[in-house]
Curated annotation (Swiss-Prot):
GO cellular component annotations of the record: chloroplast; mitochondrial small ribosomal subunit
Record GO biological process: translation
Family, similarity comment: Belongs to the bacterial ribosomal protein bS18 family.
Name of the protein described by the UniProt record: Small ribosomal subunit protein bS18c
Main subcellular location: plastid
Length: 72
């Protein structure tokens, strides 16, 4: 059985996750605008919930796009 290496979270445990911090939220979405899963980012369950809620709020307020634009 192989031991999996735990990924380091890009945010600290005590760091406040805010919907206005677009630079932080962009670390947790793909180029297509999808929210990255917890196993890919290495955050805790509580942090993942806060991140998802903040991204959804930022989308509603037009701070983040719902989907990426297709620029050819």
């Amino acid at each position: 059985m192989l031991a999996q290496k735990q990924k380091l979270s890009p945010i600290s445990v005590n760091q406040k996750i805010d919907y206005k911090d677009i630079d932080l939220l962009k670390l947790f979405i793909t180029e297509q605008g999808k929210i990255l899963p917890r196993r890919a980012t290495g955050v805790t369950v509580q942090q993942q919930r806060q991140i998802a809620k903040a991204i959804k709020r930022a989308r509603v307020l037009s701070l983040l796009p719902f989907v990426a634009s297709n620029s050819i």
